[in-house]
Structures are given as C-alpha cells and as structure tokens.
Amino acid sequence: MTLTLGHFLSLGAMLFALSVIGIFLNRKNLIVLLMAIELMLLAVNMNFVAFSHYLGDMHGQVFVFFILTVAAAESAIGLAILVLLFRNKSSIDAEDLNTLKG
C-alpha cells in the first residue's frame, strides 16, 4: 500500500482537530495553549508539504521553512512572556495575564 495525498491530508486534519480540541478544552494553562497552537501550525505545514509533493512544486516546501521560522519566534516570545508571568505571579494561568498591564 502506498501513501497517497489523502493519507497525509487526513493526518493533517486530525492533528489540526486535536489542537483545536486542546485549545477549547484547556483555557487555563498557557503552556498547553502554546503547544496546541504549535501543533496547529505543524498540521498546516504537513498539508503544505503534502500538496507540494503531490503537485511537484517546491514553493510549498519553501513556504514551510518561513512558517517554521515565524513559529520559532512566536514560541520564544510566548515562553518569555510566560517566564515573566511566572516571576511576577508565581502561576501560569491565563486569568493572571491581564495583570501584566503597565
């Protein structure tokens, strides 16, 4: 059995749905929310690579590198904000994020 485009798109859709469920079920822990958003971006990247391979075009794979770069910067900024929140409030709950207003 060979892996077709439908297999990769189904896996990408399952990963995307899992991340959406993770976002809706967990509203308090910001680290889990950040991981769910990253999983969502990886699901989108998988679809880009699958379509790029299926169509024989490299543009989708190049676009994935740009998305991964932005996702890495987003993760670094998000984790820096979480460290700041933990230092100030000793918790990483989403409700405490409003108290960082200066």
Swiss-Prot record:
* Catalyzed reaction equations: a quinone + NADH + 5 H(+)(in) = a quinol + NAD(+) + 4 H(+)(out)
Q: Which GO terms describe its biological process?
A: ATP synthesis coupled electron transport
Tell me which UniProt keywords the record has, alphabetically.
Answer: Cell inner membrane, Cell membrane, Membrane, NAD, Quinone, Translocase, Transmembrane, Transmembrane helix, Transport, Ubiquinone
Q: How does it sit in the membrane?
A: Multi-pass membrane protein
Reading the lineage from the top rank, the first entry is Bacteria
* InterPro entries listed in its UniProt record: NADH_UbQ_OxRdtase_chain4L/K, NUOK/Mnh_C1-like
Chief location: membrane
Q: What is this protein called?
A: NADH-quinone oxidoreductase subunit K
Protein's organism: Paracidovorax citrulli (strain AAC00-1) (Acidovorax citrulli)
Question: What phylogenetic lineage does the species belong to?
Answer: Bacteria, Pseudomonadati, Pseudomonadota, Betaproteobacteria, Burkholderiales
Question: What's the gene?
Answer: nuoK
